[in-house]
C-alpha cells in the first residue's frame, strides 16, 4: 500500500505499489482520478517527490 499526495489541499489517495526500483515505481489506483504531472508518494516510511511519466488505465509510472 502507498499514499499519494496530489495537492496540499486535496485528500490523500491510497493506491497499490506494484513495482519499485531505485529510479521509479509502478502504482495502481482503485478508481480513476486525474493525476497532476508531479506528486509525492509515501510507501512505508519513505516519501518521494515524483513525476508521472506514463499511465495505462488504473496503473501509472513515476520517476523519482
Question: What residues fall within each predicted segment?
Answer:
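Structured alpha-helical
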Residues: 1-64
Amino acid at each position: 500500500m502507498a499514499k499519494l499526495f496530489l495537492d496540499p489541499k486535496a485528500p490523500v489517495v491510497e493506491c497499490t505499489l506494484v513495482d519499485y526500483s531505485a529510479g521509479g515505481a509502478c502504482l495502481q489506483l482503485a478508481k480513476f482520478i486525474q493525476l497532476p504531472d508531479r506528486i509525492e508518494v509515501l510507501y512505508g516510511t519513505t516519501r518521494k517527490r515524483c513525476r508521472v511519466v506514463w499511465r495505462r488505465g488504473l496503473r501509472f509510472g513515476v520517476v523519482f
